[in-house]
Amino acid sequence: MKLLLAIALMLTTVMWASTQQPQTVHTYCGHHLARTLADLCWEAGVDKRSDAQFASYGSAWLMPYSEGRDQRGIVDECCLRPCSVDVLLSYC
Protein backbone atom coordinates (compact mmCIF):
# COMPACT_ATOMS: atom_id res chain seq x y z
CA MET A 1 0.00 0.00 0.00
CA LYS A 2 2.82 2.39 0.89
CA LEU A 3 4.58 1.58 -2.37
CA LEU A 4 1.43 2.38 -4.34
CA LEU A 5 1.04 5.68 -2.49
CA ALA A 6 4.69 6.56 -3.13
CA ILE A 7 4.35 5.80 -6.85
CA ALA A 8 1.14 7.85 -7.11
CA LEU A 9 2.81 10.77 -5.34
CA MET A 10 5.84 10.54 -7.61
CA LEU A 11 3.69 10.45 -10.76
CA THR A 12 1.64 13.42 -9.55
CA THR A 13 4.81 15.39 -8.88
CA VAL A 14 6.27 14.58 -12.30
CA MET A 15 3.03 15.50 -14.07
CA TRP A 16 2.75 18.77 -12.12
CA ALA A 17 6.38 19.69 -12.83
CA SER A 18 5.95 19.04 -16.55
CA THR A 19 3.00 21.45 -16.75
CA GLN A 20 4.88 24.32 -15.11
CA GLN A 21 6.24 26.81 -17.61
CA PRO A 22 9.75 28.01 -16.82
CA GLN A 23 9.94 31.77 -16.58
CA THR A 24 11.87 33.35 -19.39
CA VAL A 25 14.69 35.56 -18.21
CA HIS A 26 16.31 38.42 -20.10
CA THR A 27 18.94 41.05 -19.45
CA TYR A 28 17.58 44.61 -19.39
CA CYS A 29 19.98 47.57 -19.32
CA GLY A 30 19.83 51.33 -19.87
CA HIS A 31 16.96 52.71 -21.93
CA HIS A 32 15.63 49.21 -22.60
CA LEU A 33 15.34 48.59 -18.84
CA ALA A 34 13.59 51.91 -18.21
CA ARG A 35 11.16 51.47 -21.11
CA THR A 36 10.33 47.86 -20.23
CA LEU A 37 9.75 48.74 -16.58
CA ALA A 38 7.56 51.72 -17.50
CA ASP A 39 5.48 49.59 -19.89
CA LEU A 40 5.06 46.74 -17.39
CA CYS A 41 4.11 49.07 -14.54
CA TRP A 42 1.65 50.94 -16.75
CA GLU A 43 0.04 47.68 -17.89
CA ALA A 44 -0.17 46.53 -14.28
CA GLY A 45 -1.83 49.82 -13.34
CA VAL A 46 0.93 50.93 -10.99
CA ASP A 47 2.31 54.45 -10.99
CA LYS A 48 5.95 54.66 -9.92
CA ARG A 49 6.15 57.03 -6.97
CA SER A 50 8.90 59.61 -6.70
CA ASP A 51 11.14 59.90 -3.64
CA ALA A 52 9.72 63.37 -2.98
CA GLN A 53 6.34 61.85 -2.13
CA PHE A 54 7.94 59.97 0.75
CA ALA A 55 10.27 62.72 2.01
CA SER A 56 8.10 63.60 4.99
CA TYR A 57 7.23 60.05 6.08
CA GLY A 58 9.60 59.41 8.96
CA SER A 59 12.79 59.86 7.00
CA ALA A 60 14.60 61.13 10.11
CA TRP A 61 14.18 57.83 11.97
CA LEU A 62 14.56 55.63 8.88
CA MET A 63 17.96 56.96 7.84
CA PRO A 64 20.08 55.14 10.46
CA TYR A 65 18.50 51.82 9.49
CA SER A 66 18.95 52.19 5.75
CA GLU A 67 22.65 53.09 5.73
CA GLY A 68 23.96 49.65 6.64
CA ARG A 69 21.69 47.65 4.34
CA ASP A 70 22.79 46.07 1.12
CA GLN A 71 21.61 48.50 -1.57
CA ARG A 72 20.85 46.13 -4.42
CA GLY A 73 18.65 47.61 -7.08
CA ILE A 74 17.07 46.85 -10.38
CA VAL A 75 20.37 47.20 -12.26
CA ASP A 76 21.92 44.51 -10.04
CA GLU A 77 18.87 42.30 -10.52
CA CYS A 78 18.19 42.76 -14.25
CA CYS A 79 21.22 44.29 -15.98
CA LEU A 80 24.13 42.50 -14.36
CA ARG A 81 22.14 39.24 -14.35
CA PRO A 82 19.13 38.10 -16.36
CA CYS A 83 15.78 38.53 -14.60
CA SER A 84 12.15 37.56 -15.10
CA VAL A 85 9.09 39.75 -15.59
CA ASP A 86 8.07 38.98 -12.01
CA VAL A 87 11.29 40.56 -10.74
CA LEU A 88 10.68 43.63 -12.91
CA LEU A 89 7.11 43.92 -11.62
CA SER A 90 8.40 43.91 -8.05
CA TYR A 91 10.01 47.30 -8.78
CA CYS A 92 6.74 48.96 -9.85
UniProtKB/Swiss-Prot annotation:
Annotated positions of the Pyrrolidone carboxylic acid modification: 20
Remarks, miscellaneous: Silk worm has two kinds of PTTH: 4K-PTTH and 22K-PTTH; there are many forms of 4K-PTTH.
Protein known as: Bombyxin A-5
Assembly and oligomerization: Heterodimer of a B chain and an A chain linked by two disulfide bonds.
UniProt xrefs under InterPro entries: Bombyxin, Bombyxin_A, Insulin-like, Insulin-like_sf, Insulin_CS, Insulin_family
Signal peptide: 1-19
UniProt function note: Brain peptide responsible for activation of prothoracic glands to produce ecdysone in insects.
PROSITE patterns linked: INSULIN (PS00262)
